[in-house]
Amino acid sequence: NVGLRGYGGNARSWMQLKPELPQMADEKGIIFVCPDGKNSWYWDSPENPAYRYETFVTSELVKYTDGNYATIPDRKARAISGLSMGGHGALWSAIRHKDVFGAAGSMSGGVDIRPFPQNWEMSKQLGEFAANKASWDAHTVVNQLDKIVNGDLALIIDCGEADFFLEVNKDLHNRLLARKIDHDFITRPGGHTGTYWNNSIDVSPGSVLLLSA
């Protein structure tokens, strides 16, 4: 399982959030890989050629992991999950590379970036919103759903009721329903916080770890 962290984090963010993750992974026989995606939003940036994080996550990282660890090198045994920016990245990566991943989970994911054009350095990767609306449209998760049909991916989406990303997650949920794509959609009390994400791993562990079990 690939675990993508949020904006401003680092490769140790998941371990700091949930120190029990290694034990949970051992109990389930899962390899949990936590890359550092900088503040890339896990795109191959059209503005910054040095930021090719979609390629890194979906190709280079997978090949390295399969080549150096005792994995099952099959999409059915591979999941990707993330929180916040990483939730966007997990869904973006899995939907666009369903040949690589069989499951994806998002916690508090920024699944539609367009309502937030001034935030989280996204303009460094896509250009300023006003002058690059087509690029922003093309780089948001909710506009990728034509790439999958029901059964392509196991999907779980989790977002707190006080989270500023709640409405875009509800929109994603409704779009998936309209396309008759099966998925789990979970909302609970809580915001865009470490406490919520820590509890999510216990309440809905499939969104992070056990989806691939």
Language model features with spans:
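Non-catalytic cap/lid and distal C-terminal segments of serine-dependent acyl enzymes
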Residues: 1-213
